[in-house]
Design a protein with these regions (language model features):
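P-type ATPase nucleotide-binding
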Residues: 443-574, 584, 596-611
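Conserved cytosolic catalytic loops of P-type ATPases
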Residues: 26-46, 52-53, 187-190, 220-313, ...
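Hydrophobic alpha-helical transmembrane segments
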Residues: 131-141, 148-151, 158, 165, ...
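Conserved ATP-binding TGD loop and adjacent catalytic N/P-domain core of P-type ATPases
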Residues: 17, 38, 505-510, 541-683
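Transmembrane helix-loop-helix hairpins at the membrane interface
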Residues: 78-228, 339, 446, 464, ...
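Membrane-embedded alpha-helical bundles of multi-pass transporters
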Residues: 103-118, 150, 169, 405, ...
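Flexible metal-binding regulatory segments at protein termini and peripheral loops
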Residues: 1-122, 236, 316-317, 321-329, ...
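Non-transmembrane, extramembrane segments of multi-pass ion/lipid transporters
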Residues: 60-77, 112, 133, 138-153, ...
Length: 741
């Protein structure tokens, strides 16, 4: 059984990887992925051994709060920005008290300047008050950090909590000696506590703002979903809930309103804003017979539409589900960071303790408290400067921003692995009709051995039951010439060949067949000299003999810009192959015209499937680009499946990438975005590993002989900057652009 839910209380990748590691050890858990950024978890488990409630209990034992839905954050008295501002104010107050005299004696009043028990104690008490206020403002670090430590799942908050608490306790200890007149003054770390917390809070705030902006893509789409729609019933408008709409309902769409579910216009016309699908800002003109999609907006004029999907299966629902899955899933490249994070925090705590002991022993002065002070500073610096956040943010932040960028390009990735794998593709297999071409073949000529209107009537009656684009071309042609439709029975579809049905022909019920040449065993011939898509119409005389009645010649022109985009793809060193069920002449012509490397014509669904298998067996990483029902098996077999927007539901389910702008440029964009994303992730990981590899030894004091020691305050600043640098580098993907060929 597969389940998705949310986990609250996670602060860094040590949290998410700890949950994965703990549950992954259970025999009944087959697979688990926890995403830190959107707090989601996907788990696959054996329902015969456990249930979701038991899994929730296991997660709660680790110190986290699993929930089926995210709860709204409780409104606090201070907003995050106000809390941050107050932390900065009180931090400056404490720094002023602790360091003002060193900077300039005139900065402090005389009562706090003289070094004697009374003035030093008063100064320290004021620092303590300021530090406690800052700690209260940053209390989440202590609540989450010590909670995680108690459950033996230490995280970033644990490092901050231990380090600042150690500094506070040491300061309180020294303050006690001053208060009891055993010491004349103490060496306090109140300003270090404040500066560390302030820097960490600033870093976290920047992280959260950036994360929220990246997550806005799905939130914006969800806002496009109307709660109600106008349903026509007995010639009256009735406002109904969108969830109650069923296929076949007639809906009225008013100007300025969103389309509730997918459907087809049956009366009127409109201009629709489909930018949430295609990324294109210009409105799209729609008329009777055109499809409309949920979540798009009607600019002006009202129209009637017939629902072809319910809310659950609508285009918008599928997009939201894809974005959620993409944001919740993990790329393979993140596994390295997860493995390191699983031992990172415990290792840092061990290193900090070891460094403390070593410095306590080898510190250069014989004074114990002097040595203790140096050792404590090293201990706190090591804990604070270590940054599992930079490591944990490296991959998911880039994936999050990349998915947001993809949606603006009309692209949607099924999961992070699809985004990661697209860059590795070295062979692309294209379907022709509707993928490279406009997908709307038009009849350019008809050759008939019977009365033309009768042929049109027979063909359109049978083809009307098909969703194939070629069939629609025939139906449209017949409709324009007012050919009457006939009643049918015993409809049979032979996938990849054609359709047959019993139809009234010359006063008798005859089996009429409509399809390609291989669908027939003709006893007669039709001389056709022109090239194009041939659709034959015939009468079945027996099981093995057919009489040809006529043929439609259609043409499907290539989409605008396809040739240039295929050239861009080939410039990446990728092999291209056209795999089509069309005849050899048409496929060859299309291949030469568009500059595709090779082609296979007259390919049936099984032929396409076999070719994909063959390419994969040769070690090729294959991307299949298609849009029709016949493509579904091949799409599922390919390494990366790309579906053009208006494909059938079956094809969309098999897709790794969906292009809602129905443009081959999307294929090139997906590959380039994949390359840019992985490059960005590698930059983030390189920085995160280098940062920790360099700064942890520095915090330990390895360059003490060169008079280089990092104070806890500087360590806090460095830690915050490391996370912020990863976030800012990930944001560079927002500026990703596709260069025109």
């Amino acid at each position: 059984m597969k389940e998705s839910f949310y986990i609250e209380g996670m602060t860094c990748t040590a949290c998410s990887s700890g949950i994965e590691r703990s549950l992954g050890r259970k025999s009944f858990v087959k697979k688990i992925e926890v995403n830190l950024l959107n707090k989601s978890a996907n788990i696959e488990f054996d329902e015969n051994q456990t249930n979701l409630d038991e899994i929730f209990k296991l997660i709660e034992k680790l110190g986290y709060s699993p929930k089926k839905t995210l709860t709204k954050e409780k409104k606090e008295f201070f907003s995050p920005n106000v809390k941050l501002a107050l932390a900065v104010v009180f931090m400056l107050f404490v720094v002023y008290l602790s360091m003002g005299a060193m900077l300039s004696p005139s900065l402090l009043p005389e009562s706090l300047l003289t070094i004697n028990n009374h003035s030093n104690f008063l100064n320290a008490c004021l620092q303590l008050i300021g530090a406690l206020i800052v700690m209260h403002l940053g209390r989440d670090f202590y609540i989450q950090g010590f909670k995680a430590l108690w459950h033996r799942q230490p995280n970033m908050s644990s490092l901050i909590a231990i380090g600042t608490s150690a500094a506070l306790i040491s300061s309180l200890w020294q303050l006690y000696f001053v208060y009891t007149n055993q010491w004349s003054y103490g060496h306090y770390y109140f300003e270090s506590v404040c500066v560390i917390l302030m820097f960490v809070m600033v870093g976290k705030r920047i992280e959260n703002v950036s994360k929220d902006k990246a997550l806005d893509a799905m939130q914006a789409l969800m806002k496009n979903t109307p709660k109600t729609a106008l349903k026509m019933q007995n010639n009256q408008q009735i406002e109904v809930l969108v969830d109650s709409i069923v296929v076949g309902d007639i809906l009225k769409v008013l100007p300025g309103s969103a389309i509730a579910v997918d459907g087809e216009i049956i009366e009127g016309e409109g201009e629709l804003d489909e930018s949430m699908l295609s990324g294109e800002a210009l409105p799209v003109y729609k008329k009777v017979g055109d499809k409309v999609f949920s979540g798009t907006f009607n600019s002006h004029t009202s129209f009637l539409m017939k629902a072809t999907q319910n809310n659950k299966n609508s285009t918008l629902s599928q997009i939201i589900e894809m974005i959620h899955n993409a944001q919740s899933s993990k790329a393979e490249i993140s596994r390295l960071a997860d493995k390191v994070s699983s031992v990172f925090v415990p290792s840092v705590i061990a290193i900090a303790i070891l460094a403390f002991v070593v410095w306590l022993i080898i510190a250069p002065k014989p004074d114990f408290w002097w040595n203790f002070g140096i050792a404590l500073e090293v201990f706190v610096s090591v804990l604070v400067i270590s940054c599992p956040c930079a490591l944990g943010l490296a991959t998911p932040m880039s994936i999050l921003v990349a998915n947001q960028k993809a949606s603006s390009l009309g692209l949607f990735f099924k999961d992070a692995k699809s985004l990661e794998k697209a860059r590795l593709v070295n062979t692309i297999v294209f379907d022709k009709t509707g993928t490279l071409t406009n997908g709307k073949p038009v009849v350019k000529s008809v050759h008939s051995k019977i009365e033309l209107l009768e042929l049109l009537s027979l063909a359109s009656s049978i083809e009307k039951s098909s969703e194939h684009v070629i069939a629609k071309g025939v139906v449209e042609y017949a409709k324009e010439r007012n050919a009457p439709l006939k009643e049918m029975s015993e409809i049979k579809v032979k996938t990849g060949f054609g359709i047959s049905a019993k139809v009234d022909y010359q006063g008798a019920k005859e089996i009429i067949k409509v399809g390609n040449s291989e669908f027939f065993n003709p006893i007669n011939t039709l001389e056709i000299e022109e090239n194009g898509i041939l659709v034959f119409v015939g009468r079945a005389i027996s099981e093995k003999e057919d009489e040809l009645l006529g043929v439609f010649v259609l043409e499907d022109l290539p989409k605008k810009g396809v040739k240039e985009h295929i050239a861009q793809i080939k410039d990446l060193g990728i092999n291209t192959l056209l795999l089509s069920g069309d005849n050899r002449e048409n496929v060859k012509k299309c291949t030469l015209e568009l500059g595709i490397d090779d082609y296979i014509s007259n390919a049936k669904p099984q032929d396409k499937l076999n070719k994909i298998k063959e390419l994969k067996e040769k070690g090729q990483i294959v991307m299949m680009v298609g849009d029709g029902l016949n493509d579904a098996p091949s799409l599922a077999m390919s390494d990366v499946a790309v579906v053009m927007a208006k494909g059938s539901d079956v094809s969309v389910q098999a897709a790794d990438i969906v292009s809602f702008n129905n443009d081959i440029k999307s294929v090139y964009s997906a590959i380039k975005l994949s390359q840019a994303t992985i490059k960005n992730i590698k930059e983030n990981l390189f920085w995160a590993f280098c940062y920790n590899s360099v700064f942890i030894p520095l915090a330990c004091g390895v360059l003490y002989k060169a008079n280089i020691m990092l104070s806890p305050a500087i360590a806090g600043l460095a830690m915050s900057l490391s996370s912020v640098s990863v976030v800012l580098n990930s944001q560079r993907l927002r500026n990703f652009k596709i260069k025109d060929h």
